């Protein structure tokens, strides 16, 4: 299933073929930055280890 099929009508107005769905590890200023959800998941996993 392609990424374009999941777009609603409003999103199609500003969706271009050079855009990509966001990766979990994107590079910002040469440094790998974890997404917010991954940071939360990791901290939760550390907090609830037993």
UniProtKB/Swiss-Prot annotation:
Biased composition (Polar residues): 26-41
Organism for this UniProt entry: Bacillus subtilis (strain 168)
Record region (Disordered): 21-50
UniProt protein name: Uncharacterized protein YpzG
Source organism, top-level taxon: Bacteria
